Each structure stands twice: as C-alpha cells, then as structure tokens.
Amino acid sequence: MKCCPASILDRFNAIKVINVMGLRLNGRSVPWLLQTRKFINITSPRYTAGRPVILNENQLIRYLPNYTNKGDEEVTRRKKLHEPNGPKFHELPLNQNILDGLSTNFAEYKNSTPLQQRIINALMKSGVSFIVRGWNGSGKSFGAMLSTLSMYFEALKFLKHNPVAGKPVQSGCQVLFIVPNDNLAAQYQFWIERLLHGITEKEELQHIYKILTLTPASLDSFQNRPPYIGITTFPNLQHCIKKNQPILKQFTSQLQLLIVDESDLVIPDHGRSRRLSSPEILADKIFLSSFIQLCKKNLRINMDDENVGGMGIHSQLHGKGSIPTMVFMSASNSKNGVNYLSRYITDQLGIIGIDRKHQWYWNLTSTPSVFHYLIKAQAEPKTTKVTLTNLPYEFVRFNNSMHSIGDNNFSYNNSEAVLQIFAQSVPRILNIEAKKSKLENNILKCVMIVLPKEFNPHSFCNQYKGFAVGNRFWQCRTLSTESLNFSTNLNNVVFVANPSEIRGLHLPSITHIFHLWSTFSGVAYQHIAGRLGAMGQTGKIFNFIIPDYYKSNDFKKTDFRRCILFMLQRVGIRPKSYEFDDEHF
C-alpha cells in the first residue's frame, strides 16, 4: 500500500517517521539509511481513521461464488512468487556460534523466512527502533532471539581482544524481552537452551539469560547477578512498576534493547477498544508509557566508551540516547500503533510489514497448508446424540451493524451442557482424522482444545480425563509451564487452554485445533489459528458453533452464521466443507 502524500502530513509528525524515499531529516543527511533500505521499510504513516476493510483482487478471488480448488493452487503459486523462502541462515549476519547451534540443534530449519531476514538484518545492522507486523508462524520471536544471542557472542569476541573492558555481566541487563504470558517465556527458555546445547557450559547460561518472576529468589538473582538477556511478562513487569521495585532502576539504567513480543496487547492504539472484549489479557493502558518514562529517567545518557564497547552492543545499536532501542512485534500491529510510538521515538522509526496488512500473502492466507472448518453442533431433542453439520459458506458484504456485533463477545447459558456437546464432538472428529492419517501415511500426534475464557481448562481436564479413539487414548492436559513440552516426539496429548495462554506459542507436535467459538474478534481468531502452520507445517482448525445455548441478545437478532463468516472474511479465511465419512454424523 502506498503512503499518503506528504502534503497532508504536518511537519511535527512527518519528522518522526522517515520516508524511505527521502534522504534528509531536518536538513541533516542520513547516509546510513541507504544501507538499511533492503531489509527494513522506513516510511511515513497514514494519518486516516475509519478505513473500511480492503480486499484486493487476489483476496476477492477466494470469495467469488464460482470459487474452486483451482483458485487455491493459483493463490499458492502467486504466494511463492511474491514471498519465496528467505536466505539460508548462514547468509545472514549471525555469529558463528549461533550458526553452529542452528545446524546442530535446529536442523529442521534450513532457511529463514522473509520476515526473519528483515528482523535479523534490522537488529544487527541498523540500530533503529522498529515495529513489525507479520503473519503467525513467520518466525518473529525466533528471529529476534537469534539476533540477541548473536550480540552476546559478539560481545565475548570483543572482550577477548579487549580484556580491559571487563566481563559482560558487570554492565547489567542489556536486552529485555517482554512477553504476554509465562508459557511464551518458557518457550524462549527452551529455544535458548536447545540452541546453545553443546556450545556453552550450563553454568554460563545464567550469565546469558534469566526469567524475571516475582519470587524473592528471582528478584535477588536479577539484582545481584544480572544476565545479558532478561525475559519477563507484562503482568510481572507491571507489578514491579506499581510497587516501585528497586530492581527496575538496576536494569533500566543499563538497558540498550527492549523487545516487546505480542506488542498489540500493550500499545493503546485505536484497535485496543475493539480488543477489550476479546479473551486476551491486555496490559494496563499506561503500562508501556510508564516503562518508557522509567527508562528515560534511569538510563545513563553519557555512557563511557569502555562500558558500551565492553558489552559489544554499541556496534549493533547505533542509536545512543535517552531511551533504549525498541522493537515491537505482533501479527496485529497497525499504523495506529506506529502513530502512538512516534510520540516517544522521535528520531527514526522503521516499520516492517505494516503496509502489508491487507496483502493476502502476509496474513493467515500465507499458510495455505492450514485448513479451516466451521461446524455446527446440536444435541437432538430427548437424546444425547450430537449432530454435526457444516455451515455453508457465503460472501458477506460489509455492514456497519454486523461490524459492531462482530466486535462483541458472547457467552453461554448452560456451560455444562455446552461442554458435554463439545466433548462428544471432539473424539468423533478425531476418529475420522485418525483414519485419514493412516490412509495418507501421516502421523496424528497431538491436538489442542481452545475454550472460551469463561471455561476453566483445569475443570475440563478433571471432568474429561481424556478421549478413547480406536485403540488410542488421548490424555487431556492443561497448557501450564509445568506441562509444556516443545518436543516433536510427543503423542496422544490433548492440550486444553484459554486464548490468553497460547499467544505466540509454537508447539510443533500439535497438528489440529478444536476451537469452541466464543468471540467475533478477528484479532483473537488470528492468534488462535496461528498456533498451526509455523515454518510451513500443515494443520487443521475446527471451529465449533453451539447456537442453542447462546445468550447474547444481539446474536439472537442476527444470523450467527453470517456474523462468523464475516469475521473470518476480515482475516482472509474461507472455511472449507468437512467430509464426514462416519455414518453416525
């Protein structure tokens, strides 16, 4: 999408975000910008509001009445034409230790994704704060983690040739990851330990990274032995700010790089009001601004060259100022977020993928190997039998009343009856999928159940211990940090979670998701469905609708099928018709 003409931008906002075609800012040349244009899109935001949903011609083909599977092949072909695989990791500016760890411990990842290429180059070369919008499973978190670990080993290399500079840990926490939940923090921990297995000693890991929790032991460890990379969650950091914990001054005064994962949950842009009704846990509205102000207050502006060089981070992060270099990553970032961040980042702000919001190869449709289904479940009167039927597809035109309904969540009248219907539906689909996997020579390993926020996953697992399907028993397990397993060898497990617990997670053993539809938020569905299809993997997501127990007054006045199809349409999804080959359906 093209930027708006410069004439409609006021001077104050225009200087905040550099236009990629311009080479001067306030009369000063920025020659380093020419070196970054290939991997980071630095452009001006569009200052408009209330834009309707835009569907280009490639998107519209998926909604035409005469749409066929041949159209899928065309979409896939054009996707590959526009966004091929990124370069191999050894072609990117990563430290050799990181490349060795990738080839040894992540052998399944041969090539980077186009988005990883942009993130790694921007972090390692430009030193510019930037905001990223990329499809789910595009490797945003993994690419950022590789870059920060590479910075650590570059610091060690510097110290080897400059022993007078001192140890890296003496300068405190240099990089801070902020994530929405403990599960995503555990995933970062798993990635780091797996990547560095056989490369660093186990004792050295505590100097490289630590997870900040609210326990006294964790706070003391951060205070006295700060790591190079800190990882914490929105709630934990928010609690530290409210309680004015002494540790805040310790690491904000040394912080050089701040990476906010799933940043749309903390940026109070205009889309936040729409997400307030979604099942995700949002951070406090002033959380981000409070933390940035804290960094401004505590960060040492006049850092001597020995300390900065000793960490080796100044060579990567050119921008030395009153706030650290900041990176914001999410599949739901928008230009409103760019406008908000421009209040604090007043020199240069890069954007990656923001202009591609409505491009079909930059969203959920970028993973054509993931199939979406919409199934209505109903209990027959006076019996316990459940009937499953496909909801027929139709193109839904834009309608303001449906738009408002689509942004409101709804709940159920009888949660116990709803769970009984849902618990009967899941094993029946599993039975069909197990038969198909044998015929197609695919292994059906693990699945995930996503319940509305009013349902408790622990209660579900206690009530339904598991599902017997054929000669296999699928054990129900909550998605807690104690039970998380990022191995690809896990089998016969049903992970049960709420939407707020799965943000950003990549569990490679999961191939199917069973989602009990409870919200019309396109943002929420995008992140639920995004748990599949990472790095080109295949998968299926089954959306179950149980309309007999909806209690929303708005929903009773409106065709629920059209509302749900409208929300799927907003994220570029056309559900397929599922083939029920079981006679009981």
Swiss-Prot record:
GO molecular function ontology, one term from the record: translation regulator activity
InterPro entries, sorted: DEAD/DEAH_box_helicase_dom, Helicase_ATP-bd, P-loop_NTPase
Chain positions recorded as ATP binding sites: 134-141
EC number(s) from the headed UniProt entry: 3.6.4.13
Helicase ATP-binding domain location: 121-351
Motif DEAD box: where in chain: 261-264
EC top class named in words: hydrolase
Keyword Translocase belongs to the record: no
Domain of life the protein comes from: Eukaryota
Deletion phenotype: Decreases the association of cox1, but not cob1, mRNA with the mitochondrial small ribosomal subunit. Decreases protein level of mitochondrial translation factor mtf2. Strongly decreases the protein level of several mtDNA-encoded products, including cox1 and cox2. Impairs growth on the respiratory carbon source glycerol.
Keyword Transport appears in the UniProt entry: no
GO cellular component, one term: mitochondrion
Stated family: Belongs to the DEAD box helicase family.
Protein name: Mitochondrial translation ATP-dependent RNA helicase mrh5
